[in-house]
């Protein structure tokens, strides 16, 4: 399997991203560090993308591959809305990406993705995808990247079913903070988004700092 390929593992170094299912929406969070080997190449790397008004995605892995997929799925989401007048359902978006990735499985995109979205029929949904199109619907939480083992430890210990978005935001920050303390390839701050019935909200650095102060006061 591709997950056992040494080259794939090399590309997977760096990054921590998390997704959390809450009773009223989805929380996504990432760190901001991009690395090239042992070099910190970027301290403000964008790893959290708004796809449309009700869907966002995190990326981990090869930057060029991930950005290409962001452009593809953003264009498809826009076309879907132009044709139907509605936003593309999150599960349809995830399935489309899965098909794109599987179609390139012999020359794979070296990425891991988390998609969070909301629609009026299915509610809040969270999906994870691997490099060859493996698609999982997550019912609690997920994490990707080199810092994910530490993040998973915090999430496993503190996640509660049907937790509120407010608690989910704090848990996302706590899991990212723990990962950044232990993983040299993750760091330089946090990006945070919430997706619920009101749409996608990307939090500012000041808002994230306020949440961190609540968590660690």
Swiss-Prot record:
GO BP term, pick one: proteasomal protein catabolic process
Known regulation of activity: The formation of the proteasomal ATPase PAN-20S proteasome complex, via the docking of the C-termini of PAN into the intersubunit pockets in the alpha-rings, triggers opening of the gate for substrate entry. Interconversion between the open-gate and close-gate conformations leads to a dynamic regulation of the 20S proteasome proteolysis activity.
Localization terms from the record: Cytoplasm
Record has Cytoplasm as a keyword: yes
PROSITE patterns named in the record: PROTEASOME_BETA_1 (PS00854), PROTEASOME_BETA_2 (PS51476)
A GO term, aspect molecular function: threonine-type endopeptidase activity
Reaction catalyzed: Cleavage of peptide bonds with very broad specificity
Catalytic residues identified in the record: 15 (nucleophile)
Residue numbers covered by the propeptide annotation in the UniProt entry: 1-14
Record-listed E.C. numbers: 3.4.25.1
Chief site of localization: cytoplasm
Alphabetical list of InterPro entries matching this protein: Ntn_hydrolases_N, Pept_T1A_Psome_bsu_arc, Pept_T1A_subB, Proteasome_bsu_CS, Proteasome_sua/b, Proteasome_suB-type
Keywords: Autocatalytic cleavage, Cytoplasm, Hydrolase, Protease, Proteasome, Threonine protease, Zymogen
One Pfam family in the UniProt entry: Proteasome
GO cellular component, one term: cytoplasm
NCBIfam families: arc_protsome_B (TIGR03634)
Assembly with partners or alone: The 20S proteasome core is composed of 14 alpha and 14 beta subunits that assemble into four stacked heptameric rings, resulting in a barrel-shaped structure. The two inner rings, each composed of seven catalytic beta subunits, are sandwiched by two outer rings, each composed of seven alpha subunits. The catalytic chamber with the active sites is on the inside of the barrel. Has a gated structure, the ends of the cylinder being occluded by the N-termini of the alpha-subunits. Is capped at one or both ends by the proteasome regulatory ATPase, PAN.
Alphabetical list of HAMAP family matching this protein: Proteasome_B_A
Role, per record: Component of the proteasome core, a large protease complex with broad specificity involved in protein degradation.
UniProt family annotation: Belongs to the peptidase T1B family.
PANTHER family linked: ATP-DEPENDENT PROTEASE SUBUNIT HSLV, METALLOPROTEASE TLDD
Protein's name according to its UniProt entry: Proteasome subunit beta
Gene symbol of the encoding locus: psmB
